[in-house]
Every structure is written in structure tokens, then in C-alpha cells.
Swiss-Prot record:
Signal peptide bounds: none
Gene assigned in the entry: tsf
Biological classification of the source: Bacteria, Pseudomonadati, Pseudomonadota, Alphaproteobacteria, Hyphomicrobiales
Function: Associates with the EF-Tu.GDP complex and induces the exchange of GDP to GTP. It remains bound to the aminoacyl-tRNA.EF-Tu.GTP complex up to the GTP hydrolysis stage on the ribosome.
Involved in Mg(2+) ion dislocation from EF-Tu: annotated segments: 80-83
Alphabetic keyword roster: Cytoplasm, Elongation factor, Protein biosynthesis
GO CC annotations, alphabetized: cytoplasm
SUPFAM superfamilies: Elongation factor Ts (EF-Ts), dimerisation domain (SSF54713), UBA-like (SSF46934)
Top-level lineage group: Bacteria
Family the entry assigns: Belongs to the EF-Ts family.
Location of the protein in the cell: Cytoplasm
Source organism of this protein record: Rhodopseudomonas palustris (strain BisB18)
Pfam family, one: EF_TS
Keyword Cytoplasm annotated: yes
Protein name: Elongation factor Ts
């Protein structure tokens, strides 16, 4: 049996908004497994949280760069937000994005790529020595189309093409570039706001979909619903779920009448003058998935002074 700590209960409460005692029971019932505890609370109807909220746990910048039919996102982490406002660091992020646009998303290739008389890896090391903080190229993504364009958007940019959140969206089309670019900008902003998990249902992780179905089914079983009815309810529930997490099925944030993104794209074909296919998107939020180390200052002082 796992030990349930106050920190675990606090994390679950912050994630789900459920009371402390219910969170403690959920963790106890599931041997300290955070995801299982979240699902347990959802089955009890106590939480609507689908997963632990992605808390920004690292500083730095997301860099976005496009060149007609190709676009790239990079994440470069630093230790403090202060460094993210440093012009040298901002220049480093832009340089890395330019390199990634040429060599692709493989981090080893980016780090080994030549920059002047040295390499990207050396440029990062030099910046660390000059600025005095550890920095790392965490990830990169590239989208490309044969015909059309890749659009980008950086939310709350601290400098041109770099900020805390970046998006690229790929549009395949032979239509008017200016109209396509306008649509691409709107789609990029939509992705930044709505945070879809996949382009369409087929692109979702099967394990995630299976877990979603299990949570819904168990919830209605506990309510005493007959199995035949549960199957239909879950089927309808999945349709709603897809509208929440799949880009093409989401309600387009720029349409007041509630059209889906797919419908908005289809409608835009008239303005563009050719068919449009959204072939992919990438959304990077700074620090997502990185656990941030925290410290108890009072405990550190007590430890340093030999107190318990």
C-alpha cells in the first residue's frame, strides 16, 4: 500500500477541484496512482477533469518560423523567466528555429548543424557561459506541404516569432495564397485557444479513447443504467468528446453560429478558389510535461540550522 502524502492530495485537489477528503480517499482506493484516482473521482461524478492540468514547469521560449510551405516550432528552456527576456537568448531561439527549418526536427541534427564557425550545440554552450544559466533545446517539430502553406501563431510574443505558446498549422491547397494565409492565421489562433489533441478521431491515442469509454460506462453502471442503454449513451458521449478534442470537429472560435472547423474550412474554399486540406498542426506550450521542482524555504532553513 502506497503512502498517501499531503502533497499528493494537494496535487489531486488542484487538478480536479474536489475536496481534500474525497481526494485522499481516491488516492487510497487506487494505491497512490494519480491518473487512476482522477478516473475514480470522475466515475463517482465528483470531477470533470480528464487529465492533470498541464502546469508550466520550465522557463524559456517557444520559437515559431515559417517559409511558405514549411514551418517549425522549437522549445528552448532556461532556468528563469528573466533569461527569456534577454535579447541574446531570444536571438539564440530564433537562430535554432532557422536551423530547424533547414535540417528538420531531429535534435541531434540541429545541435550538430553548423552556425558560423561552430555548431548550434556550441552556440548554446556559449550562451550558458555568458548568461550564467543552464539552457537546453528540448524539442522541435516541422510541418511541410507540397502545395499551399504552413501558418503560425505565437501567443503573447515577447519578441517577433517567440513567446510562451506557439502553433503551426499545415494547409494543402492550390488556391489563393492571401486568403489561405488568413485562414491559416485563424486556425493557428484557434489551436492555441482550444488546444485540440488530434486532427480527427482516428488520430487520438486508442488507449486514451478506451479509458474515456470505460470511465463513461462505469459512471452509468453505478447509476443503475441497463447495459443496452449504457452502450448508446457511451456512443453519444464519445461524439461529444471528439467535438471537444479533435480540431476538425471543434466549434470554430471565429464563427458565432457554431460551425465546426471542418465546416469553416469547407466554406473558405469558395474564397480560396480551390479545395483545402488541413494536413496537420503542432501546438507547443512552454514547459508542458516537465515537473517543476519546488522547495519549502522554512524546511531548508531548519535543515541548515540542524533543527527538525
Amino acid at each position: 500500500m502506497a503512502t498517501i502524502t499531503a502533497a499528493m492530495v494537494k496535487d489531486l485537489r488542484e487538478t480536479t477541484g474536489v475536496g481534500m477528503m474525497d481526494c485522499k480517499q481516491a488516492l487510497t482506493e487506487n494505491d497512490g496512482d494519480m491518473q487512476a484516482a482522477i478516473d475514480w473521482l470522475r466515475k463517482k461524478g465528483l470531477s470533470k477533469a480528464a487529465k492533470k492540468a498541464g502546469r508550466v514547469a520550465a522557463e524559456g521560449l517557444i520559437g515559431a518560423l515559417t517559409d511558405k510551405t514549411k514551418g517549425v516550432l522549437v522549445e528552448v528552456n532556461s532556468e528563469t523567466d528573466f533569461v527569456a527576456r534577454n535579447e541574446q537568448f531570444q536571438g539564440l531561439v530564433k537562430m535554432i528555429a532557422q536551423v530547424a527549418l533547414k535540417v528538420g526536427a531531429d535534435l541531434d541534427k540541429i545541435n550538430a548543424a553548423p552556425v558560423g564557425s561552430s555548431t548550434v550545440a556550441t552556440a548554446i554552450a556559449d550562451a550558458i557561459a555568458t548568461i550564467g544559466e543552464n539552457m537546453t533545446l528540448r524539442r522541435a517539430a516541422v510541418l511541410e506541404v507540397g502545395q499551399g502553406l504552413v501558418a503560425s501563431y505565437v501567443h503573447n510574443a515577447v519578441t517577433d516569432g517567440a513567446g510562451k505558446l506557439g502553433v503551426i498549422v499545415a494547409l494543402e491547397s492550390a488556391g489563393k495564397t492571401d486568403e489561405l494565409a488568413a485562414l491559416g492565421k485563424q486556425l493557428s489562433m484557434h489551436v492555441a485557444s482550444a488546444n485540440p489533441q488530434a486532427l480527427e478521431p482516428a488520430g487520438l491515442d486508442p488507449d486514451v479513447v478506451r479509458r474515456e469509454k470505460d470511465v463513461m460506462a462505469d459512471k452509468y453502471r453505478q447509476q443503475g443504467k441497463p447495459e443496452a442503454m449504457i452502450e448508446k449513451i457511451v456512443e453519444n458521449g464519445l461524439k461529444t468528446y471528439y467535438k471537444e478534442v479533435c480540431l476538425l470537429e471543434q466549434a470554430f472560435i471565429f464563427d458565432e453560429k457554431g460551425k465546426s472547423v471542418a465546416q469553416a474550412v469547407k466554406e473558405a474554399e469558395g474564397r480560396v478558389g480551390a479545395p483545402i486540406k488541413v494536413t496537420g498542426f503542432v501546438r507547443y506550450a512552454l514547459g508542458e510535461g516537465i515537473e517543476k521542482q519546488t522547495s519549502d524555504f522554512a524546511a531548508e532553513v531548519a535543515a541548515a540550522s540542524g533543527q527538525k
